[in-house]
A protein has these predicted regions:
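Bacterial N-terminal signal peptides that target proteins for export
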Residues: 2-10
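Short, glycine-anchored, charge-dense loop/turn motifs used at functional sites
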Residues: 186, 435, 514-521, 543
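Beta-propeller domain segments
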Residues: 26-34, 69-72, 111-113, 194-416, ...
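Acidic, Gly/Ser/Thr-rich repeat motifs that build Ca2+-stabilized beta-propeller blades
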Residues: 25-199, 260-272, 276-279, 359-407, ...
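Bacterial N-terminal signal peptides
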Residues: 9-20
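Residue-level detector of functionally pivotal "anchor" positions at catalytic/ligand-binding pockets or at interdomain
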Residues: 462-505
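C-terminal tail/sorting-segment detector
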Residues: 523-525, 530, 537-561
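Short beta-strand/loop motifs in extracellular/secreted proteins, especially
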Residues: 397-400, 507-511
C-alpha cells in the first residue's frame, strides 16, 4: 500500500516531466526510433465543419470485417454536454445527431450529458449507455441509463430508456465525473464526481462517505433486463460491514472528480485522472496568487485492487487535514452529512496516488496494448506497448508515456510524446479499436473555439511486427483450455457471474446451451469478438455449450455451483 504522504521522490519525479526529448526513450527491438514525423493527425470532427459544441466523451464501433484494414472503418459516437448524442459516420465522414436531451443545467454547472459506452454486444442489440443529469419535480440525479439505437444506428429511441443506476445529487455541481467504460468481462466502470463546487473544500457527505456513490469509481455488471449485479471483489462485499453503511457498487472511494478513466484490457488495472482543488485548500482558505502555485495538486491514480484514495483528507502528496491517520482514517466527530445517508466512521486505509501532479488538470489516456494480429495500417507501434498515456487539460501539448513496474505500484519512467500534435483542452483520450489514438478537444464552458474537435492520431511508420499479440484477459485465459474440446471459436467462461462468455471468432458464430438431457435452453448469434451473457443458465447444475463458427465446432461442459 502506498501510504506515505511525505515522500519527496514523488514530487521530484512529477517536476521532472520534460527531461527527455519527445519519444527518445521509447524503443523497440528491430525497429527504428520514433520521431514526430511518424505520426499524422486526421481531424474527424471540427467546429467549423460540424457545428459541435462542448464535446465530452466518445465510444467506438469497428466496422472492418475480419482481415480487413481497420483504417477509416471506425464510427465514433460522442456526447455534447448540453444534451446531444452524435456520431461521426466513417462511411460518409458526416456527423449525425442521433438524439437530444432536454436538460436542466445550472448556469455555473458542469453537469449535463457526459459519459457514453456501447454495450459489449452492440453489434446485435444496439444498446448505448449514457451518463447524464436528470431533474424532475421529485428527483435530481445523475443517471446511468441504457438506450436503444435503431438498426442503422442513426436514431436514439428515447422511449427505450432503462434507468440502470440513479445517483441523487444537488443541481449546479462543477464536479460531475462522467466516465463510462466496459471491460472484457462485461462489467461497467463509472467515474462519479463529488458533486461539489470549487469552494466546497471538505465534502464529508460524498467522497469519504462509504454509503454514497459520489466521488467514487463504481463497478457494476449490467443485465439484459436493465438491472445490474455486483461483480466479485468490490470494496465493500456483502456481509462484511454493518448493514446500511456501505454501497456494494463502490470499487474506489476517496476521489474528488475522476473525470477520465481507463482500463488495462489484459490485467484490468484501473487508471484515472483525479481533478484536484484550485479554488480553496482543504481547510477552506482561498487559493490565490503564490498560494495557488504551491497548494494546487492533481493526481494520476492506478488501482490494481479496490481501495480508498483518501480525498478529502489527503490530496496529491499532501495530508490536508490534521489528525487523520492514513492507515485508519476516521470521520471527524460532528461532521455534517448534508442530508445524505451516513456511512462508516472508520474508513479503509488511504492509498497515496501513484503520481501526484502539481500542474493544472490531470486527464488519463489509455494503457496501450499492441496487437500484432490487428490488421490496421494506422495502429500505434509496439514502442507504446503497456505504456500508460496521460495528458493535461490546461497544459497545451503536455502528453506523457508512463512506464509501469510489473506490479503496478510505481512509475519507472515518464517520457514526453506528441510534442507537435495539438492537444487543445483534451477531455477524452483513448485508443480506438483500430489501434490509433483519438482525442476530444473541448470548446470551453458554454462557448466555442476554433480548436474544438475530435482528432485521430495515426502512426505512419513501418514498425508493425507480428508480435506481441494481444494477450487474453487473465480470468478468461484461466477458464479456457480445460473447458471443452473441438476446433471451434475460442471461448472463455467468466467465473463467479451469470453465464458470461467471451467469444473470439474469425466470423459469424452461433452458441447453443443445453441441459444434460439435450433440452435446448438458449441460443445466441454473433460475429467476431464479442461478449455474450446467457441468463437462462440461472440455477445450479451441469450444462452443455455448443459453439460453431468458421473455425469449426466445439462443445464445452459447464458446471454451475
Amino acid at each position: 500500500m502506498r501510504d506515505n504522504w511525505n515522500m519527496p521522490a514523488w514530487t521530484l519525479l512529477a517536476v521532472g516531466l520534460i527531461a527527455n526529448p519527445a519519444h527518445s526513450a521509447l524503443t523497440w527491438s528491430g525497429c527504428s526510433d520514433l520521431t514526430d514525423a511518424d505520426f499524422k493527425v486526421t481531424t474527424l470532427v471540427s467546429r467549423g465543419a460540424d457545428t459541435i459544441e462542448e464535446p465530452m466523451k466518445m465510444a467506438f464501433d469497428l466496422l472492418a470485417q475480419p482481415g480487413e484494414d481497420a483504417k477509416g472503418k471506425v464510427d465514433v459516437y460522442f456526447t455534447e454536454r448540453l444534451g446531444k448524442l452524435r456520431k461521426f459516420d466513417s462511411r460518409t465522414s458526416k456527423v449525425l445527431t442521433l438524439g437530444s436531451f432536454n436538460l436542466t443545467i445550472g448556469e455555473s454547472s458542469s453537469d449535463g450529458l457526459m459519459g457514453i459506452a456501447l454495450d459489449p454486444t452492440f453489434k446485435s442489440n444496439h444498446w448505448v449507455y449514457l451518463y447524464y443529469t436528470f431533474k424532475s419535480a421529485s428527483e435530481t440525479s445523475w443517471r446511468i441509463s441504457r438506450f436503444t439505437l435503431d438498426a442503422a444506428n442513426a436514431h436514439l429511441d428515447m422511449a427505450s430508456e432503462k434507468v440502470v443506476l440513479s445517483i441523487p445529487i444537488k443541481i449546479g455541481s462543477q464536479h460531475p465525473g462522467g466516465a463510462l467504460q466496459f471491460d472484457a468481462y462485461g462489467d461497467l466502470w463509472i467515474g462519479t464526481g463529488n458533486d461539489m463546487i470549487g469552494s466546497d473544500a471538505y465534502p464529508i457527505s460524498s467522497s469519504p462517505n462509504t454509503n454514497d456513490l459520489r466521488g467514487k469509481v463504481l463497478r457494476i455488471h449490467p443485465k439484459p433486463d436493465g438491472t445490474y449485479s455486483i461483480p466479485d471483489s468490490n470494496l465493500f462485499p456483502a456481509g462484511k460491514y454493518p448493514q446500511g453503511k456501505t454501497r456494494p457498487e463502490i470499487y474506489v472511494m476517496g476521489s474528488r472528480n475522476p473525470y477520465t478513466l481507463s482500463l488495462d484490457p489484459v490485467r484490468r488495472w484501473l487508471v484515472w485522472g483525479d481533478i484536484g482543488p484550485d479554488a480553496t485548500d482543504m481547510d477552506g482558505n482561498p487559493m490565490n496568487g503564490s498560494k495557488a502555485a504551491t497548494d494546487k495538486t492533481e493526481e494520476y491514480d492506478l488501482a490494481t485492487a479496490p481501495g480508498n484514495y483518501g480525498y478529502p483528507f489527503f490530496a496529491g502528496a499532501k495530508a490536508t487535514k490534521s489528525g487523520i491517520n492514513p492507515a485508519r482514517p476516521v470521520i471527524p466527530a460532528g461532521s455534517n452529512w448534508n442530508g445524505y445517508p451516513p456511512g462508516l466512521d472508520t474508513l479503509p486505509p488511504a492509498i497515496a496516488p501513484i503520481y501526484p501532479y502539481p500542474r493544472a488538470c490531470a486527464i488519463t489516456g489509455p494503457i496501450y496494448r499492441y496487437d500484432g494480429e490487428l490488421n490496421s495500417s494506422i495502429k500505434m507501434p509496439p514502442h507504446f506497448h503497456r505504456k500508460w498515456l496521460v495528458t493535461d487539460f490546461n497544459g497545451a501539448n503536455k502528453v506523457f508515456a508512463f512506464t509501469l513496474s510489473e506490479d503496478g505500484k510505481t512509475i519507472t519512467a515518464d517520457d514526453p510524446i506528441f510534442t507537435r500534435i495539438p492537444f487543445n483542452a483534451p477531455v477524452d483520450f483513448q485508443a480506438g479499436p483500430d489501434g490509433a489514438f483519438y482525442v476530444v478537444s473541448y470548446s470551453g464552458y458554454r462557448s466555442v473555439t476554433a480548436s474544438t474537435s475530435i482528432i485521430r492520431i495515426d502512426y505512419t511508420g513501418d514498425c508493425r511486427p507480428a508480435l506481441p499479440k494481444l494477450e487474453t484477459p487473465t480470468a478468461i485465459a484461466q477458464a479456457r483450455g480445460s473447458t471443452g474440446t473441438g476446433p471451434g471459436p475460442e471461448i472463455g467462461v467468466l467465473p463467479g457471474r451469470e453465464l458470461s462468455l467471451a467469444v473470439k471468432s474469425a466470423g459469424a458464430f452461433s452458441i447453443h446451451l443445453y441441459d444434460l438431457s439435450g433440452k435446448p435452453l438458449a441460443s445466441r448469434r454473433g460475429k467476431g469478438n464479442m461478449h455474450v451473457t446467457l441468463e437462462e443458465a440461472g440455477s445450479a447444475g451441469i450444462y452443455l455449450l455448443s459453439v460453431t463458427g468458421p473455425e469449426g465446432s466445439r462443445t464445452l461442459k459447464l458446471v454451475r455451483d
